[in-house]
Amino acid sequence: YISGQYVATTEEEANEVYDRFGVYAIHAGRGDRLGGGDAESLDYFPREKADFADNKMPNPCYAIYLTCDPAVLADIDKYIEYAKTTKINAFVVNIMDGTSIGYNSPVYEEYSPTAYQYANNTVEEYRQVIQKIKDAGFYAIGRLTVFNDSFFCQDHPEYAIADQYGEPLMVANASYWPSAFCRYVWEYKVALAIDAVETMGFNEIQFDYVRFPDRTDKYEEAGTIDFRNEYGETKAQAIQRFLMYATDILHEYGVYVGADVFGEASSNYVTAYGQYWPAVSNVVDVISGMPYPDHFARNGTYRPWEHPYETLLDWTESAAKRQSETPSPAIDRTWIQAYNAIQPPYNEYGVQEIGDEIRGLREQGFTGGFMAWNASCSLTKLEELRPLYEALED
């Protein structure tokens, strides 16, 4: 599943090609602290990033997020008219978000009939939305969740993360996860991405939930979880190798590939769920951290979500260090919190707070843009943020 172009035939050749920039010394001391694997066993082969003449990525890229709910997509003309009057230049639209299915792709018929049955839109309904976005001159990013897929596990329990008896195990967020070690799952998600590119015309595929489930340590310690690790890989190896496989294939279709990672991935260790920033950034075209201030733990009386500028400033300092630890880093384009805090005192996030997040990113050198996460896709909220989005830097 990995291209032969990355294979060296001798140790001397491997050392010359793979460690040209001395990057392995950086990662050598980062062992397997949390069960996700060690950093040294991952791949840092310098990769030439894609730059398609007929598919130019906005720089910076400022995107708003849309679900695939029919009620949201019915308002696509309103979202487009709004974006035309601001500096917004891109849309992120769900192809698949767990059990929320964008359209009835024939790929589902083959791999996951249950997903096909529950599609929110027909192919033509969904295509009209993406075509309107592109016809209006906006960059179209298709968001596709990978290893959080209860429908697929229902159809293929043999590929699901299982309990000690071989039955699918409900894990994070009360959902079922196919194993990231299973190549059939890789094939399925890449086939779905290809269909979205060919049928809908997306400029970029963004993989989310490209990780193992978090908070599985209690099962691992008790020996009551089976990840179906057929090839004896670490979690981080499986995640990076999936991204290598997917990126190489999707580049053949002239589209960029992005990956979302938890905010924790900016730390200098391999996370328990297999995300390691330098290894992901080295492979994909765009890396998107998710440092939502209300997802950070409080420190005594200090609530990070009440200090969005300082929180993003500190986080980006760490993420920038990880970017420097790989020979071919991806473009940084960060998910920012564009919704009111979900922790007490439930701070409102408006022009000031979201502007502070953006300022924290830029002051640490993250200038690739942002994507504003608001799961409600509220037009009223967008109007409140108009002064901010009108004044964004070119």
Model regions: which residues?
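Aromatic- and acidic-residue-enriched segments that line the glycan-binding/catalytic groove
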Residues: 103-114, 149-172, 210-229
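Aromatic-lined carbohydrate-binding/catalytic grooves of carbohydrate-active enzymes
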Residues: 86-121, 214-222, 382, 389
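Active-site-adjacent "subsite" loops/lids of carbohydrate-active enzymes
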Residues: 52-71, 128-131, 142, 147-195, ...
